[in-house]
A protein has these predicted regions:
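Positively charged, polar, low-complexity stretches
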Residues: 1-112, 117
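Phosphate-binding/catalytic loops
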Residues: 120-125
Length: 125
Protein backbone atom coordinates (compact mmCIF):
# COMPACT_ATOMS: atom_id res chain seq x y z
CA UNK A 1 0.00 0.00 0.00
CA UNK A 2 1.34 3.43 -0.85
CA UNK A 3 2.29 5.94 1.79
CA UNK A 4 -0.15 8.52 0.46
CA UNK A 5 -3.06 6.10 0.69
CA UNK A 6 -2.18 5.08 4.24
CA UNK A 7 -1.93 8.76 5.23
CA UNK A 8 -5.37 9.42 3.76
CA UNK A 9 -6.80 6.39 5.57
CA UNK A 10 -5.34 7.71 8.81
CA UNK A 11 -7.05 11.09 8.27
CA UNK A 12 -10.37 9.37 7.51
CA UNK A 13 -9.99 7.31 10.70
CA UNK A 14 -9.25 10.49 12.67
CA UNK A 15 -12.37 12.22 11.31
CA UNK A 16 -14.50 9.13 11.93
CA UNK A 17 -13.27 9.00 15.53
CA UNK A 18 -14.16 12.65 16.06
CA UNK A 19 -17.62 12.13 14.54
CA UNK A 20 -18.27 9.05 16.69
CA UNK A 21 -17.12 10.71 19.92
CA UNK A 22 -18.93 14.02 19.33
CA UNK A 23 -22.48 14.55 20.53
CA UNK A 24 -23.11 16.53 17.33
CA UNK A 25 -21.35 17.76 14.21
CA UNK A 26 -22.19 21.04 12.51
CA UNK A 27 -21.11 21.56 8.92
CA UNK A 28 -20.41 25.08 7.70
CA UNK A 29 -19.20 26.86 4.60
CA UNK A 30 -16.44 29.38 5.27
CA UNK A 31 -15.84 30.74 1.74
CA UNK A 32 -14.29 34.21 1.94
CA UNK A 33 -13.59 34.31 5.68
CA UNK A 34 -10.14 35.49 6.68
CA UNK A 35 -7.69 33.47 8.74
CA UNK A 36 -8.25 35.93 11.58
CA UNK A 37 -12.02 35.36 11.42
CA UNK A 38 -11.57 31.59 11.53
CA UNK A 39 -9.08 31.84 14.40
CA UNK A 40 -11.51 33.99 16.39
CA UNK A 41 -14.35 31.53 15.77
CA UNK A 42 -12.17 28.58 16.75
CA UNK A 43 -11.27 30.33 19.99
CA UNK A 44 -14.91 30.99 20.87
CA UNK A 45 -15.90 27.38 20.13
CA UNK A 46 -12.90 25.87 21.93
CA UNK A 47 -14.11 27.47 25.16
CA UNK A 48 -17.39 25.58 24.72
CA UNK A 49 -15.78 22.17 24.18
CA UNK A 50 -16.17 22.29 20.40
CA UNK A 51 -13.41 21.71 17.88
CA UNK A 52 -13.70 23.53 14.53
CA UNK A 53 -11.61 21.96 11.75
CA UNK A 54 -11.20 22.04 7.99
CA UNK A 55 -10.76 18.72 6.19
CA UNK A 56 -10.99 17.59 2.58
CA UNK A 57 -14.61 16.96 1.58
CA UNK A 58 -13.94 13.51 0.12
CA UNK A 59 -12.36 12.33 3.37
CA UNK A 60 -15.29 13.72 5.34
CA UNK A 61 -17.75 11.82 3.14
CA UNK A 62 -15.88 8.54 3.70
CA UNK A 63 -15.60 9.17 7.46
CA UNK A 64 -19.31 10.00 7.84
CA UNK A 65 -20.31 6.83 6.00
CA UNK A 66 -17.91 4.75 8.11
CA UNK A 67 -19.40 6.34 11.24
CA UNK A 68 -22.85 5.19 10.09
CA UNK A 69 -24.25 8.60 9.14
CA UNK A 70 -25.85 8.63 5.70
CA UNK A 71 -27.11 11.80 4.04
CA UNK A 72 -24.29 14.23 4.73
CA UNK A 73 -22.66 13.88 1.29
CA UNK A 74 -24.55 16.86 -0.17
CA UNK A 75 -23.23 19.12 2.60
CA UNK A 76 -19.57 18.45 1.81
CA UNK A 77 -19.26 20.74 -1.22
CA UNK A 78 -16.94 23.73 -1.56
CA UNK A 79 -14.94 25.19 1.34
CA UNK A 80 -16.27 23.22 4.29
CA UNK A 81 -15.41 23.22 7.99
CA UNK A 82 -16.82 20.96 10.69
CA UNK A 83 -17.60 21.78 14.31
CA UNK A 84 -17.25 18.65 16.46
CA UNK A 85 -19.43 19.40 19.49
CA UNK A 86 -18.40 17.65 22.71
CA UNK A 87 -19.87 20.25 25.04
CA UNK A 88 -23.17 22.10 25.00
CA UNK A 89 -24.79 21.83 21.55
CA UNK A 90 -27.10 24.80 22.13
CA UNK A 91 -24.22 27.10 23.14
CA UNK A 92 -22.06 25.99 20.20
CA UNK A 93 -24.94 26.41 17.74
CA UNK A 94 -25.73 29.86 19.16
CA UNK A 95 -22.07 30.88 18.85
CA UNK A 96 -22.00 29.79 15.19
CA UNK A 97 -25.33 31.51 14.51
CA UNK A 98 -24.20 34.76 16.14
CA UNK A 99 -20.86 34.64 14.31
CA UNK A 100 -22.73 34.14 11.02
CA UNK A 101 -24.83 37.24 11.74
CA UNK A 102 -21.74 39.44 12.02
CA UNK A 103 -19.83 37.51 9.31
CA UNK A 104 -22.37 36.62 6.61
CA UNK A 105 -19.72 34.66 4.69
CA UNK A 106 -20.11 31.86 7.26
CA UNK A 107 -23.03 29.66 6.21
CA UNK A 108 -24.50 26.91 8.39
CA UNK A 109 -25.31 23.97 6.12
CA UNK A 110 -26.58 21.32 8.53
CA UNK A 111 -25.09 18.46 10.48
CA UNK A 112 -25.84 15.45 12.60
CA UNK A 113 -27.08 15.09 16.15
CA UNK A 114 -26.92 11.64 17.74
CA UNK A 115 -26.10 10.17 14.30
CA UNK A 116 -29.24 11.67 12.74
CA UNK A 117 -28.91 14.21 9.93
CA UNK A 118 -30.38 17.63 10.74
CA UNK A 119 -30.96 20.73 8.61
CA UNK A 120 -29.40 24.15 9.00
CA UNK A 121 -32.75 25.42 10.29
CA UNK A 122 -32.66 22.87 13.13
CA UNK A 123 -29.22 24.09 14.17
CA UNK A 124 -30.18 27.77 14.01
CA UNK A 125 -33.19 27.40 16.31
Amino acid sequence: MSTVRSEKEAVVAEIRGKIESASAVIITEYRGLTVQNLAALRGQLRGLGTEYRVYKNTMCRFAAREAGIEGLDDLFVGPTAIAFVDGDLAASAKTLKDFAKTNPLLVLRGGAVSNKVVSAEYIQV
